[in-house]
Swiss-Prot record:
Originating organism: Phenylobacterium zucineum (strain HLK1)
Cofactor: [4Fe-4S] cluster
GO molecular function, one term: 4 iron, 4 sulfur cluster binding
Enzyme Commission number, as recorded: 7.1.1.-
Keywords: 4Fe-4S, Cell inner membrane, Cell membrane, Iron, Iron-sulfur, Membrane, Metal-binding, NAD, Quinone, Translocase, Transport, Ubiquinone
Gene expressing this chain: nuoB
Name of the protein: NADH-quinone oxidoreductase subunit B
């Protein structure tokens, strides 16, 4: 069997047949024209970046959240906004309207009667939109799991991006969840093609 050397062509999966790539090659990083232009602009004090990278960077630093506080987890969410933890220093500011927010924090027990309202508010949010499920009740029903009226996790109603465990989770856990969401946005981007 032939050993692989750097620079050998690698066959792309059948869905993209006919194209080959070279290991370690990234067109953004290795385009000679882009490198030349980038170097000339850097000498003049400018920074070059792809537009989608710039938009993703800006979006992670200006996430607007709205609360869907249903129970005691909302108290910890309020504490995370106070001066000790101050979520706004991460660019995570509260908004009252779903039409102005990017992130919904579902905190507390979601019951069957409230599920349609949650979905309606989620549908009013502009794209791209993200959901943080905060606490055991929002994650999977929690203490009220066996109740006839409890939805066993808000992910049955809306798609969830980050789960914050705990009963109730601490403000530090929510801050960590926000940082994880920002990492996810940086990793996946926001532009759909």
């Amino acid at each position: 069997m032939e050993e692989r050397r750097p620079g050998m062509g690698v066959i792309v999966p059948a869905g993209e047949a006919g194209r080959t790539t070279v290991e370690g090659y990234d067109p953004k990083l290795h385009d000679p024209y882009f490198d030349g232009v980038s170097q000339r602009l850097a000498d003049k004090g400018f920074v070059t970046a792809a537009a989608d990278d710039l938009i993703t960077w800006a979006r992670t630093g200006s996430l607007m959240w709205m609360t869907f506080g249903l129970a005691c987890c909302a108290v910890e969410m309020m504490q995370a906004s106070m001066p000790r933890y101050d979520l706004e220093r991460y660019g995570f500011a509260p908004r009252a309207s779903p039409r102005q927010s990017d992130v919904m924090i579902v905190a507390g027990t979601l019951v069957n009667k409230m599920a349609p309202a949650l979905r309606k508010v989620y549908d009013q949010m502009p794209e791209p939109r993200y959901v943080i499920s905060m606490g055991s009740c929002a994650n999977g029903g929690g203490y009220y799991y066996f109740s006839y009226s409890t939805v066993r996790g808000c992910d049955r109603v809306v798609p969830v991006d980050v789960y914050v465990p705990g009963c109730p989770p601490t403000a530090e856990a929510l801050v960590y969840g926000v940082l994880q969401l920002q990492k996810k946005i940086r990793r996946t981007g926001t532009i759909v093609r």
